[in-house]
Swiss-Prot record:
Source organism phylogeny: Eukaryota, Metazoa, Chordata, Craniata, Vertebrata
SUPFAM superfamilies: Cysteine proteinases
Residues that hold Zn(2+) according to the record: 186, 189, 233, 236
Active site, per annotation: 48, 317
Protein name: Ubiquitin carboxyl-terminal hydrolase 12
Region (Disordered) residue spans: 145-169
Organism: Homo sapiens
Name of one Pfam family that matches: UCH
Length: 370
């Protein structure tokens, strides 16, 4: 058995090496970006949900730069962030241009910190992304809180802030956080009330044969509150019919869009996948911004896509496609391949049966040009 395992592992390593060599040749020495590395990640038992998100985040350049900068700071106690920083640093400082890295330390820490991921079952890539970003933000805020305990910041300046004040935004917020405004207009007195809500990613409903722009417009459709759902108007001091809609007040540097492809079917008593064809362009401008939006004309470029392959949330596979400089790459765990930009259309979804196996965009990462 041990001999068979060794032979199998050796064959796997040879295959990885061949793939890496082929990729390097395909890109060519003159076209290969300076100081860039393309490394696949070893799958430790259904960890493709994690690998695909990590690859997408690595090629969100502002995020990568902040994680690498964190690595250069004085050593902190081990956390999910230190493990992520070690992984990114390991990729960025490799002598080889292409290859494979085992993210074992990160996976071990992830399973230790959250029982949801402490198994060998397939997990949801969006849940992992959400958990990772919020955990990193919590770690950074806790570290800043510790630095403030003596009333001094790392640069030696005295901190006079109230300890009960809202935590300072972290670089996670600076990169991914946007703001929604929930507007409600009373149909009796026409008074408009609004409430702001921050987000790190937007989850949008999907429909057949549409585009991400259409999905975002649907996200901001006007909803009528009536019957038992009437709105309590402070001006009228009674429940009234009202119009409610959600608009984007502040657009983030990197816009992460989650396509809600998994829906619970009562007749099946389980979740199934909506493999609908949803076109996502290489360039994007949002039109559902509020009147007082701080940056309504922001243009975005697609930089990464986490793709779900399969027919349901608990089975299937995740891969990532990313833009690096002027070309696109596909990361499938330890395999890395160069693909044409036109090949992205293959990941829009299907025009036929919703329950069929499909390779369809699940999380889109758009980076602002400014």
């Amino acid at each position: 058995m041990e001999i068979l395992m060794t032979v199998s592992k050796f064959a796997s390593i040879c295959t990885m090496g061949a793939n890496a060599s082929a990729l390097e040749k395909e890109i060519g020495p003159e076209q290969f970006p300076v100081n860039e590395h393309y490394f696949g990640l070893v799958n430790f038992g259904n960890t493709c949900y994690c690998n695909s998100v990590l690859q997408a985040l690595y090629f969100c350049r502002p995020f990568r730069e902040k994680v690498l900068a964190y690595k250069s700071q004085p050593r902190k106690k081990e956390s999910l962030l230190t493990c992520l920083a070690d992984l990114f640093h390991s990729i960025a400082t490799q002598k080889k241009k292409v290859g494979v890295i085992p993210p074992k330390k990160f996976i071990t820490r992830l399973r230790k910190e959250n029982e949801l991921f402490d198994n060998y079952m397939q997990q949801d890539a969006h849940e992992f992304l959400n958990y990772l970003l919020n955990t990193i933000a919590d770690i950074l805020q806790e570290e800043r809180k510790q630095e403030k305990q003596n009333g001094r910041l790392p640069n030696g300046n005295i901190d006079n802030e109230n300890n009960n004040s809202t935590p300072d935004p972290t670089w996670v917020h600076e990169i991914f956080q946007g703001t929604l405004t929930n507007e409600t207009r009373c149909l009796t007195c026409e008074t408009i009330s609004s409430k702001d809500e921050d987000f790190l990613d937007l989850s949008v409903d999907v429909e057949q044969n549409t585009s991400i722009t259409h999905c975002l417009r649907g996200f901001s459709n006007t909803e009528t509150l009536c019957s038992e759902y009437k709105y309590y108007c402070e001006e009228c001091r009674s429940k009234q019919e009202a119009h409610k809609r959600m608009k984007v007040k502040k657009l983030p540097m990197i816009l992460a869009l989650h396509l809600k492809r998994f829906k619970y079917m009562d007749q099946l008593h389980r979740y199934t996948k909506l493999s609908y064809r949803v076109v996502f362009p290489l360039e994007l401008r949002l039109f559902n911004t509020s009147g007082d939006a701080t940056n309504p004309d922001r243009m975005y470029d697609l930089v990464a896509v986490v793709v779900h392959c399969g027919s349901g949330p608990n089975r299937g596979h995740y891969i990532a496609i990313v833009k690096s400089h002027d070309f696109w790459l596909l990361f499938d765990d330890d395999i890395v391949e160069k693909i044409d930009a036109q090949a992205i259309e293959e990941f829009y979804g299907l025009t036929s049966d919703i329950s069929k196996n499909s390779e369809s965009g699940y999380i889109l990462f758009y980076q602002s040009r400014d």
